[in-house]
Amino acid sequence: MLLEHIHYFAGIVFIAVAALLPIIDPFAGAPIYLAMTSGLSPEERARTAKLVALNSFLLLLASILIGAYVLDFFGVSIPAVQVAGGIVVCVLAWSLLNGPIAPDVPASTTLASADSLKQRAFYPLTMPLTVGPGSISVAITLGANPPRNLRALLTTTLAHVVGVLITVVAIYLCYRYADRLVRRLGKTGTNIMIRLTAFILLAIGTQIIWNGARTMLVGVLHPGVAATAPAAAAAPRD
């Protein structure tokens, strides 16, 4: 019985990490994070990385636990979230694609206040750069059908907490040491990687918009067609 619960717990953790980490992709986002915090000192950048990780943890966990209920309360569908969020991602990606990569401003001249760091850490660094509409949609899907068995519900919730924690640790490490990655790439390599990542981010935003719009169109043209979700791990028996 214990082995069955351990297997179920590990399966939920694996599903959460496997679903969230690839779509967030903090390694690819690290150069963009560094470019958007180029005016900060190394200490401020490290502090901001912690704030982004904390914000990401709270946002992802809230999306898993109550995201479906919040959307249902306001009458908002996941496709609507995808379309709106995809537009925000596209706007951010477009500004990165066409804007300056790193302004030549010494870090010592741009000491940011705590409030300023918190604001920047949430928008745009946490949302939509790190936790965008795609990862929020995935998180909501992960928590959309909680088990009715109390023990299984507690196990699932704890597993989701662990899965999100593993994901945000990866986010923190990639952002915290983004400067080392960029140093290895050099200025030209960093410029190329940021532009390429911004273009990929633009394509992802466009795809997210299309996914949401296509689901809406299917609902209008074929109202009887129900979207099917991937099967979740089976809850262990008491």
Region locations from a protein language model:
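Structural signature of hydrophobic alpha-helical transmembrane segments
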Residues: 12-29, 78-88, 157-171
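Small-residue-enriched transmembrane helix starts and helix-helix packing motifs
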Residues: 1-22, 99, 106-126
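Membrane helix-loop-helix hairpins that form the core translocation module of multi-pass transporters
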Residues: 46-100
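Juxtamembrane transmembrane-helix termini in multi-pass membrane transport proteins
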Residues: 12-64
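Juxtamembrane helix-boundary/capping and inter-helix hinge elements in multi-pass membrane proteins
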Residues: 35-46, 79, 114-117, 144-152, ...
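Low-complexity, proline/glycine-enriched hydrophobic segments characteristic of transmembrane helices
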Residues: 1, 214-238
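Transmembrane-helix boundary and interhelical-loop signature of multi-pass inner-membrane proteins
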Residues: 41-42, 62-84, 170-214
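Transmembrane helix exit motif
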Residues: 88-110, 204-215
